[in-house]
Amino acid sequence: MQLEIYNLIAEENRISISLEAICDSYSSLLWDIEFYQCGCFEVYIAASPQNVSIFQRGRIVTRSDDAQHFGIIESLQLETDAEKGDYLTVTGRFLACLLERRIIYPTITANGSYEDIVRKVLSHNVISAGIRNLPGFSMGTVSGDCWQKTARMQVSYDNILEWLYGLCETIGGSANVRLDGNALKCDLFSGTDRSLLQDDNPHIVFSDAYNNLLSFSYAADDAVQKNFAYVLGCGEGNAKKRTTFCSGAEPTYLDRYEVYVDERNTAQEEDVTDAEYLEILKSSGAEHLVQPKTASESAIAAFSTQYQYNKDYFVGDYVTMEQKRFGLIQPRIQLIGMVESFDQNGRSLTPTFKEME
């Protein structure tokens, strides 16, 4: 597998991409794809004068076998050692990190599908925002039912990258920015259910019984969860706007974990009715709910004859995890991250999972 390094030049309304080098002599590569945050990469390579001139901050790094993820070099570290040799560590994140350079300004009140809300935020701050534009940036493809659900919300001054991935985690979708010729395309999508709880798609089961689960650890903690929100908005005293929010049936007794959400700075604009304003408060309440904390670490077979990563399953998909020896099964668990590692020992896969309720 080769790495391709491109020079990126930003002009007023477009970008220009030119191939600078092709590299296959790196010592190691980490390629970390995440579903609810911006992914990242690391290249560890001998620090020759040629490599130092090739790997420059702001340039694009991509893999010859991945047409969806493009990294931008953000950090370089050069280390010289008379005995061990000279090495260059190149790190960065995928192109969605460009959205971190903008905030949502001014206040945006939006009502419609989540797709429409994202389009409005990006249009006002990234696409049709004058000198605030990201050159060549536009919306790409949209897929997944979660993006067609509707909401009303008010948002201001949030960092766009943090806001977007926070929204993604709330609704169960994701976003990715990719190169399309000399353009930047922002795709919105969702994962596919491949667990044992459905029959529309082939099942993906990682299990010690199938020899495709090399190691597995799991921990759960209820202490951090919040499942019922009291949301207070604008106004004073008895006139203060207030509502509550929970997901599904209202929790009771020992199953109820409450949180207070202060939205006094969320103004009710003249064209917003009381009912619409309460929906805005409910959206904020949804963002402050916290699921029980779970953590799992595992290693899965990189060269399994049963399932191939990025062919049979992808980051964001729902799969089944089973540890038969201890009688532990997670029938529907989401793959929210995958670190692919390439080094002298070959290729390895380290997944991150999020348990579903």
What are these regions (language model features)?
Residues D24-N51, S174, D208-E357:
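An acidic/polar, Gly/Ser/Thr-rich interaction patch typically located in mid-to-C-terminal regions
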Residues S48-M139:
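Surface-exposed cap/loop segments at beta↔alpha junctions
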Residues Q77-L99, F137-Q225:
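Short beta-strand-centered interaction patches in the first periplasmic/extracellular domains
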Residues L76-L78, R93-C97, G191-D193, C234-E236, ...:
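Solvent-exposed coil/turn segments that connect beta secondary-structure elements
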Residues G39, H69, D86-L88, N182-C186, ...:
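Envelope-exposed proteins and targeting segments
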Residues L3-I5, R57-D66, G316-K324:
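Short conserved beta-strand and strand-loop elements enriched in small hydrophobics
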Residues E34-Y36, V43, G92, T107-S138, ...:
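Amphipathic, non-transmembrane alpha-helical segments in extracytoplasmic/periplasmic proteins
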Residues M1-D24, L196:
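Polar/acidic, low-complexity leader/linker segments enriched in S/T/G and N/D
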